[in-house]
């Protein structure tokens, strides 16, 4: 990884105050299930909620048909579609209680 590799910076919830570098070609899955790379405790989060991937075109997030949705900058994203992320974007997972910012 290089210094310009995007990072997820926890703002609230289970991941608050932590930073996680996004590796190329290895999705970071998020949810309540123990098999997820990022396990989030909130009841608003689905077992397999969403995943973030670094592609050749940049960082994308995909909601995995979660019950309470995933928001990017306050707007709920459609399920099962890659949505581009850029530095400074704020992502809410299930609710504003679990969120991170792209750095």
What are these regions (language model features)?
Residues 15-16, 36-37, 46, 60, ...:
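Short, surface-exposed beta-strand-loop junctions and turns on beta-sheet-rich folds
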Residues 30, 65, 71-103:
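C-terminal boundary/linker segments immediately following FHA domains
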Residues 1-43, 53, 87-90:
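Intrinsically disordered, low-complexity acidic Ser/Thr-rich regulatory segments
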Residues 5-10, 58-64:
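Short, well-ordered strand-loop elements centered on a beta-strand within folded domains, enriched
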Residues 44-45, 58, 82:
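Residue at a beta-strand N-cap/secondary-structure junction
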Residues 41, 53, 62, 101-103:
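Solvent-exposed beta-strand sheet faces enriched in polar/charged residues
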């Amino acid at each position: 990884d290089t210094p310009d590799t995007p990072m997820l910076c926890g703002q609230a919830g289970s991941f608050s105050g932590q930073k996680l570098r996004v590796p190329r070609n290895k999705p970071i899955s998020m949810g309540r299930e123990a098999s997820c790379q990022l396990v989030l405790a909130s009841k608003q989060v689905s077992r397999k909620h969403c995943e973030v991937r670094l592609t050749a075109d940049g960082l994308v997030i995909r909601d995995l048909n979660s019950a309470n949705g995933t928001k990017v900058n306050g707007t709920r994203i459609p399920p099962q579609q890659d949505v581009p992320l850029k530095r400074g974007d704020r992502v809410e997972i299930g609710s504003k209680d679990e969120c991170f910012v792209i750095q």
